[in-house]
Amino acid sequence: DLGGGVDGSGAGSEAAQSVVAEIEALGGEAIANGANVARYDEVEAMVKQAMDKWGRVDILVNNAGILRDKSFAKGELDDFKLVLDVHLMGSVNCTKACWDIMRDQGYGRIVVTTSSSGLYGNFGQTNYGSAKMGVIGMMNTLVQEGGKYDIRVNALAPTAGTRMTEGLIPEEAFALLTPETVTPAVLYMVSENAPNKTIICAGAGAYSIAKIVETDGVWLQPEDQTPEGIAANWDAITSPEGERQPEAGFEQTVKFTGKAMEGLGLVDK
């Protein structure tokens, strides 16, 4: 925890040091490090500090974040880039610094922090939502590249009352949305029996899974492959019947070419 403000300004070690004190009071070991996750050199030094102390990195939780909330019309591009740098590139930097370590040791558990603002949208958070969906794309590909090394990558979409959300959530709801109700989801996602490529949503003691699915769709005859043809077949294109969650991007290509070959009579249905 860099200990800065919600907007990313300033820095301080108090927040991180208080967590270290809690861990040590329970008999554990911990190090506080105020690295700026947007700077790869600082992240590398942070990971080296952990390796020098413990000799392994088994778990990485990418959770650094800031807010620069404004409507897209009023927001500044510099703020947009800063939010991407911390949320998205911060996750990239930390994961990159740990990736080879996890590959070499044949084990790793990584969590990226996404958000309902990215999954579903939230007014005034175009920058934040973009970054939070960026880490989902990152997760989807890292799962494929890390599989043979037993590196599992999952995403957490938390709803919690924290320093960053204080003042944004009504007081009664804030009292229910304690970070402690999110912690069990994180711990499961970094356990030895963790799932893979899963988006878990957590808050106030409630838990759910978010999924990206694709409808089965339809193949249109060449003469119907027009905007008008799309409109005329919209119900079939959007029908949830037969929708599924692809395991990899190439499955879309296989599905579409298969439908085209069937439609053109090049293969038997």
PLM features: residue spans?
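The beta1-alpha1 cofactor-binding region of Rossmann-like NAD(H)/NADP(H)-dependent oxidoreductases
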Residues: 13-14, 34-45, 77
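A glycine-rich helix->loop->beta "capping" turn
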Residues: 26-29, 49-62, 68, 76, ...
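Substrate-binding pocket helix/loop in short-chain dehydrogenase/reductase
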Residues: 71-72, 76-81
